[in-house]
Amino acid sequence: MTSIDDAPQRSAAHDAVAEVLRGHIRDIPDWPQPGVVFKDITPLLATPTAFGVVIGALADAARALGATTIAGIEARGFLLAAPVADRLGTGLVPIRKQGKLPGPTRSASYDLEYGAATIEIHADAVHDGDRVLLVDDVLATGGTAAAAHSLLAAGGGEVVGLAVLMELSFLPGRDRVAPLDVVSLLTI
């Protein structure tokens, strides 16, 4: 598994991407609940040059992994996956919360700290031979990413990796999505 931020031989380009992220992610303490520090990416989204650098790095990761399809997890994953797919000329698979997609769907459920959640894709979104890169903003506990991985694989796609802006290394996300390759532009 890979993390650009903590790879043994980081390149200057990787360091530059991590620095761009550090300069464009805002900490919001005690949101959405006391004790949580929310990582707000809206400053990144509001800065076209910084956003372009990050999308370029994610697109480079997709190319390196041989992705032929990009899948984005609702909601902030959509903001990253769509421009990556556009830049690469690939299709985009939106992974939505249950009940948000019309027509036949495939679903996968996963446990949350208190309760459960379900995500869905269109039944025909992934095909045999598709090499899918899963894209999201943050890898934390890994529950959503693991469910998305199983959902895409059940549809016939080969999930070639998970690419995220940032990984919260103090949480078990990387272990939960193993053996997927994880490309993290910034490890916190």
From Swiss-Prot:
One of its GO terms (biological process) is adenine salvage. GO terms for cellular component: cytoplasm. It is an enzyme of class 2 (transferase). Its EC number is 2.4.2.7. Homodimer. PANTHER family: ADENINE PHOSPHORIBOSYLTRANSFERASE. This is Adenine phosphoribosyltransferase. The gene is apt.
